[in-house]
Amino acid sequence: LEPKPTDTMRQRFAPPAGFARVPVAPNSFAGWLRDLPLAAPETPVRAYDGRVLHAATDSRIAGVVALDVSPADLQQCADSVMRLHAEWLWSKGERNMSYRAAAGLALPWSRWSRGERIVPSGANIQWVPAGKPVSDHAAFRKYLDAVFAWANTVSLEKQAKPVEPDQIRAGDFFILPGNPGHAVLVLDVAE
């Protein structure tokens, strides 16, 4: 399921009166987040299987990002942080993205694109040659789903760098590691 975009975060959400968006560098993650495509305002939040999780009228919902979601129940909170970061890198033509599994194994796109796949190995996971080299976005999405299956808030927290509260910028995130844990991405900042 991929809702159709109607506008962007920057277009829909103006800074509060008396505030201005914090300047961001061109081509930065923060700038890319400001231009996230949003679905129409009446779009509900849907689960991976199409079920409505939250009605569009739910007061907790400000907007729905117009991106596809895997048909498997994989993209959770920390995964969404990694997904947006990876999609930003992809949009810039960068292919050096790498995330970590909960067990610590590095999960770089470069290995997946060479035809390797992640498989269980006892209590751990490992890379094995199992496919053909791939380089398109559909293969990249399959790679991300594999990352989502093996990464979590704990592994994301281990890759993160702490930020002082007065230095928070778009692209930073709050994380409560654990099982299940939680992560929330900062999409924009105004001062």
Go through each PLM region and give its residues.
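Phenylalanine-focused residue identity feature
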Residues: 13, 19, 29, 140, ...
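Acidic/His-rich structured neighborhood in mature extracellular/periplasmic domains
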Residues: 55-169, 175-183, 187-191
